[in-house]
């Protein structure tokens, strides 16, 4: 793959990127599906050029003082899908597809998996976070939880609620009530996420299908 064949590659003004006094620029890798920040590393001019030329992400290892092909050892390669630079041209944001869904050398999905020294999932978009909470309710049920009661009721209870919420979305739209529409769509999204959890369908599989729809 040539530099010009890579999506957005020609939009990166290599001569305008501002490197620090060590010849490096910080590069943030972000998951293309749910926006999770996966890692922060560094690039020099050679790493950025190699990334654009190959379509796979290369960094500069400050400890080893050499180019670092992400995933060359672990198999957790990063496929570059997009790249942006900030307003000062001294930081890069890489939109990537993370192979193996693991970016951190510890085996965690994201390097940002700790909060105040304690393990915590990285922040993501609202639907992803809600899906995570629902999955946690499924795996660690509590009797007072509405979500747990829905899951315990199985398809009959969950699908009945989806049908009810779908009808309420239709009625809110017919009434042209923006606030009601937002509320009913939120309820429909929530109950649909419960159905996904019940059937062990990862929300990112849905995101991939949505990505296919926009092509």
UniProtKB/Swiss-Prot annotation:
Region annotated Phosphoribosyl-AMP cyclohydrolase, chain positions: 1-126
Region Phosphoribosyl-ATP pyrophosphohydrolase, annotated ranges: 127-215
Coarse class of the protein's main subcellular location: cytoplasm
Taxonomy, superkingdom: Bacteria
One annotated GO biological process: L-histidine biosynthetic process
Signal peptide: none
UniProt GO cellular component terms: cytoplasm
E.C. code: 3.5.4.19, 3.6.1.31
Keyword annotations: Amino-acid biosynthesis, ATP-binding, Cytoplasm, Histidine biosynthesis, Hydrolase, Multifunctional enzyme, Nucleotide-binding
A single MF term (Gene Ontology): ATP binding
Pathway membership: Amino-acid biosynthesis; L-histidine biosynthesis; L-histidine from 5-phospho-alpha-D-ribose 1-diphosphate: step 2/9; Amino-acid biosynthesis; L-histidine biosynthesis; L-histidine from 5-phospho-alpha-D-ribose 1-diphosphate: step 3/9
SUPFAM superfamilies: all-alpha NTP pyrophosphatases, HisI-like
Location in the cell: Cytoplasm
The reaction(s) this protein catalyses: 1-(5-phospho-beta-D-ribosyl)-ATP + H2O = 1-(5-phospho-beta-D-ribosyl)-5'-AMP + diphosphate + H(+); 1-(5-phospho-beta-D-ribosyl)-5'-AMP + H2O = 1-(5-phospho-beta-D-ribosyl)-5-[(5-phospho-beta-D-ribosylamino)methylideneamino]imidazole-4-carboxamide
InterPro entries (UniProt xref): His_synth_HisIE (IPR023019), HisE (IPR008179), PRA-CH (IPR026660), PRib-ATP_PPHydrolase-like (IPR021130), PRib_AMP_CycHydrolase_dom (IPR002496), PRib_AMP_CycHydrolase_sf (IPR038019)
Pfam families in the cross-refs: PRA-CH, PRA-PH
Family statement: In the N-terminal section; belongs to the PRA-CH family.
PANTHER family noted in UniProt: HISTIDINE BIOSYNTHESIS BIFUNCTIONAL PROTEIN, HISTIDINE BIOSYNTHESIS BIFUNCTIONAL PROTEIN HIS7
Matching HAMAP family: HisE, HisI, HisIE
UniProt protein name: Histidine biosynthesis bifunctional protein HisIE
Organism of origin: Synechocystis sp. (strain ATCC 27184 / PCC 6803 / Kazusa)
